[in-house]
From Swiss-Prot:
<comment type="function">
    <text>Glutathione S-transferase; part of the gene cluster that mediates the biosynthesis of gliotoxin, a member of the epipolythiodioxopiperazine (ETP) class of toxins characterized by a disulfide bridged cyclic dipeptide. The first step in gliotoxin biosynthesis is the condensation of serine and phenylalanine to form the cyclo-L-phenylalanyl-L-serine diketopiperazine (DKP) by the NRPS gliP.</text>
</comment>
<feature type="domain" description="GST C-terminal">
    <location>
        <begin position="104"/>
        <end position="237"/>
    </location>
</feature>
<dbReference type="InterPro" id="IPR010987">
    <property type="entry name" value="Glutathione-S-Trfase_C-like"/>
</dbReference>
<feature type="domain" description="GST N-terminal">
    <location>
        <begin position="15"/>
        <end position="98"/>
    </location>
</feature>
<keyword id="KW-0808">Transferase</keyword>
<dbReference type="InterPro" id="IPR004046">
    <property type="entry name" value="GST_C"/>
</dbReference>
<protein>
    <recommendedName>
        <fullName>Glutathione S-transferase gliG</fullName>
        <ecNumber>2.5.1.18</ecNumber>
    </recommendedName>
</protein>
<keyword id="KW-0843">Virulence</keyword>
<dbReference type="GO" id="GO:0004364">
    <property type="term" value="F:glutathione transferase activity"/>
</dbReference>
<comment type="pathway">
    <text>Mycotoxin biosynthesis.</text>
</comment>
<dbReference type="GO" id="GO:2001310">
    <property type="term" value="P:gliotoxin biosynthetic process"/>
</dbReference>
<dbReference type="InterPro" id="IPR040079">
    <property type="entry name" value="Glutathione_S-Trfase"/>
</dbReference>
<dbReference type="InterPro" id="IPR004045">
    <property type="entry name" value="Glutathione_S-Trfase_N"/>
</dbReference>
<dbReference type="GO" id="GO:0005737">
    <property type="term" value="C:cytoplasm"/>
</dbReference>
<dbReference type="InterPro" id="IPR036282">
    <property type="entry name" value="Glutathione-S-Trfase_C_sf"/>
</dbReference>
<dbReference type="Pfam" id="PF13409">
    <property type="entry name" value="GST_N_2"/>
</dbReference>
<dbReference type="Pfam" id="PF00043">
    <property type="entry name" value="GST_C"/>
</dbReference>
């Protein structure tokens, strides 16, 4: 095993992130929102190089977010990596009444449907659009436009869902869940504008995103994630 940084001590849940930029926060904010919603004590570790051997042992995909946590008996260190997995882990470990993760099989099955849809469709489509539009050295207009077109298809699906009678949130009618948290960063006005889309074309989706954005936990998470790596300590362990 590669030697981990000396300041990486797992006494409680540790969320791994990178320095906050315009394009680095859309996935890391998801578990942070859930931690804020549930009031879970945690630490933040800002990774300087996700390609570092020690970090690839935590997440073989070499991306954030990722989590290390103590097992309930304190004997082992548990890990979760990729944003959807971190949401599922936090909900399973800390959402004891199932408010955000689902209270029964019926709720969890619907939550998993919309969580999986995001993981398989909007999430990766939006991520690759951002990559080809912002980071890829060669501009590929057809690729960029195809990905943007696929995003509109996903927005259409979400709009139809939210147009169903009484459907205030994606999975459940009465309250948000981890499916809403996963979807929000790529289905909100600022992100749609980044894609060059008029978010007003999806009025129910826009209403939903505003409703989600007004939650105090969501506000705190967005504020915090933007500042990671910009304080007195740029990289390494930051206490929550």
């Amino acid at each position: 095993m590669s030697e981990r940084p000396s300041d990486l001590v797992v006494n409680r849940l540790v969320l791994f992130v990178v320095k906050g930029t315009a394009t680095s926060t859309h996935n890391t904010v998801k578990p942070l929102i859930l931690l804020e919603e549930l009031g879970v004590p945690h630490d933040i570790y800002v990774v300087e190089k996700v390609s570092a051997p020690w970090f690839s042992e935590i997440n073989p995909h070499k991306m954030v977010p990722a989590i290390l946590d103590r097992s309930p008996d304190g004997r082992d260190t548990l890990r979760a990596w990729e944003s959807t997995s971190t949401l599922m882990y936090i909900a399973d470990a800390y959402d004891k009444d199932g408010t955000l993760g689902g209270r029964n099989v019926q709720e969890r099955s619907e939550i998993n449907n919309w969580l999986t849809l995001h993981t398989a469709a909007l999430g990766p489509t939006a991520k690759y659009w951002l990559y080809f539009y912002k980071l890829h050295p060669e501009k590929l207009p057809k690729t960029i436009e195809k990905l943007r077109s696929n995003i509109t298809v996903q927005y259409d699906i979400l709009e139809r869902r939210l147009n169903e009678p009484g459907q205030q949130y994606l999975a459940l009618k009465d309250r948000p869940t981890i499916a809403d948290i996963a979807t929000l960063p790529f289905a909100m006005k600022s992100t749609a504008e980044l894609f060059g889309l008029e978010f007003e074309k999806w009025p129910k989706l826009q209403e939903w995103s505003v409703r989600m954005g007004e939650r105090e936990a969501v506000k705190r998470a967005w504020q915090r994630v933007a500042g990671f790596g910009h304080g007195e300590k740029e990289y390494g362990m930051l206490e929550a």
